[in-house]
Amino acid sequence: MSDLSSNRLPNRASRVTNQALSAIERFLHIEALSGIVLLLAAASALIFANSQYAALYESFWHTPLGFNLGHFTLSWDLHFWVNDALMTIFFLVAGMEIRREIHEGALADFKQAILPIVAAIGGVCVPAIIYFIFNFNEGHIHGWAVPTATDIAFALGILALLGKKIPSNLHIILLSLAIIDDIIAVLIIAFFYSTNIDPSGLLIAGGGIALVLFFQWIGLASAWLYILPGAIIWWGLMVTGVHPSLAGVILGMMTPVFPTRTLVAPLTMLSNAMQILQEKNTKTDLHHISTALKKMRKGQRAMIAPVTRIQKALHPWVAYGIMPVFAFANAGVSFANFDLSSGKSFLIVFGVVIGLFVGKPLGIITASYLAVKSGLCRLPPQMTWAGILLIGFLAGIGFTMSIFVSMLAFKDIILLDAAKIGVLCGSGLSALIGLGYGFIYIKRNKDIPHSSE
């Protein structure tokens, strides 16, 4: 019996370590399943916006929500709370994903990261150029960034539908490319869609960043404590004129990638807990059992880096809550007053659709081909040009980020609806072609070792 007890500690530590190492697998599964939820949310929004409940749908998202504290009043409509507040949490998780990939993922080794970096740049430039060509004379070039984004959830969702016969390297490259795409999207939003910059806001945001660094310096590990500096950064960015949701990226990129230092080593905590459980009288002493279990949970928590722990906790909320709510709030485009025969609307729709459906795969495979042929990088094992083309099609699913950018690019409701329709059509075509081509790819590459997910 004592031998069994003595083996529990290393087994426990092993399980904790395995949980940390399999984080990317959990990420892939959550994102893949959330794609279905996102699709249902978007479809529901379209149905509501084009039904007898359209007015109710529209008025609901303009319902004011806020609170009063003495003479201080804070009130915004639900649409603002979703797009500017809830999406901050989405960007927080995105920032943590970027932080982890740079530290220990595919982006940690520059040689390994060259291919997805080059592919992502090509996948941003070509769609932007295509949109620019169609809309240059119409004066709607401000929407050039709409077809440049990739929706990780939808892309991985389609990849999941193809089953386990997809090479693992294809998963990794698509994920890395999408994360780099997120980095580029964040930079685009910060530098091209921020107006009337107020320097005083930078001081406020800088104060929030300084507070984060101070908290980390004195060893505060509780994530709840960082809500205050996060809110200060958010408010500072809004005052500055930069989209406030980018505060999430800043906070995510600052999240520690190493376990927080504790006075007692995590393994010592687990060892002490096991000693308590091994005591003779512990079997019937609920207080001692409870104390031991608390020590175990504390030890387990101390072994996992904050960036991994917080990301794991937030992912289900973002994947199954925030992103579907965002889709339901913003995908509701009414076709009643939309006139596709209008030159302005048509060119916006056409530019976005072709940018996503054609520009994304064209840019990704062209940039990758040039990089490989020039000797800058090489294709990973199990990877073929057919696989790169599949990644290109899936990267054309822009949905969430593309809609987000379109709302920053267009203030006119007619032009905004045109951009959203372009996003929905372009993303839908990319998903269908990607799925169909994916099955062809699997049949033609039966001998290539596949993912073991």
Swiss-Prot record:
Its job: Na(+)/H(+) antiporter that extrudes sodium in exchange for external protons.
Subcellular location field: Cell inner membrane
InterPro entries associated with the record: Na/H_antiporter_dom_sf, NhaA
Record membrane topology: Multi-pass membrane protein
UniProt organism field: Bartonella tribocorum (strain CIP 105476 / IBS 506)
Family as reported in the entry's similarity comment: Belongs to the NhaA Na(+)/H(+) (TC 2.A.33) antiporter family.
GO molecular function per UniProt: sodium:proton antiporter activity
Identification of the protein by name: Na(+)/H(+) antiporter NhaA
Predominant place of localization: membrane
GO biological process terms on file: regulation of pH
Catalysed reactions listed for this entry: Na(+)(in) + 2 H(+)(out) = Na(+)(out) + 2 H(+)(in)
UniProt cross-references to NCBIfam families, sorted A to Z: NhaA
Spans through the membrane: 27-47, 78-98, 114-134, 143-163, 172-192, 201-221, 222-242, 316-336, 346-366, 385-405, 421-441
PANTHER family, A to Z: NA(+)_H(+) ANTIPORTER NHAA (PTHR30341:SF0), SODIUM ION/PROTON ANTIPORTER NHAA-RELATED (PTHR30341)
Keywords assigned by UniProt, alphabetized: Antiport, Cell inner membrane, Cell membrane, Ion transport, Membrane, Sodium, Sodium transport, Transmembrane, Transmembrane helix, Transport
Gene behind this protein: nhaA
GO cellular component, one term: plasma membrane
The UniProt record lists the keyword RNA-binding: no
